Each structure stands twice: as structure tokens, then as C-alpha cells.
Amino acid sequence: MAVAEDSGMIHDIVQAYLSRLGEHHVPVWRVYLFGSYAKGTAHPDSDIDLAIFLDQDEIDGFREDVHLMRLRWGIDLRIEPHAFARSDFQDMDPYVREIVASGQRVF
């Protein structure tokens, strides 16, 4: 399965997931697709890595990750959500800087 053929499908999966987050009132501020799908190096078993910046200054990252993982059910289990607070984006630590620099903003 070629990645180029998957780009439209991945976009649809991400949009369906973002709709689900909206239905569950997740306070999404920004979302970036990162990792192999953003870099064009994905293979059929690749995760769909999403950095989800919540409109909150502080979060319990583990709790939010678990919540976001549950919401992927029925859409695509390859979705790998990574929760961040808005302040993580504003502080721009090296991990976040890499996500923003190499990722694709999808929301």
C-alpha cells in the first residue's frame, strides 16, 4: 500500500477523529499530524501520530492520553494521540518544537 494512495484516507480518518473529539467536548486548541505519515515514510502498520494541544494551561497527560485513546475506537486503532497543554506549545520544549517543525497542522 503506497503512502501517496493513503494520504486522502489518512486525512479522512483524522477528520473523523477530530469530529469525535468535538462530539465529546474535548477542548482542542491545535492538532498536528507528525511522525511517519507527516514525513511521507509510513508503511501499512504505521501509527497515525497526533499531537493534540488542549485549550488548558495544565493537564494530567496520562489521564488525557487514555481518554483520547478510548475515543479512537470505531474510527481507527492506528491513531496514536499525544495530549499536550496549550502551555506546552507556548513553552516550545524540544519535543514540541520538533513536532511543530516536522508535522502538519490539521486543526
Model regions and ranges:
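Conserved loop-to-beta-strand segment in the C-terminal subdomain of adenylate-forming
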Residues: 47
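P-loop (Walker A) phosphate-binding loop of NTP-binding proteins
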Residues: 36
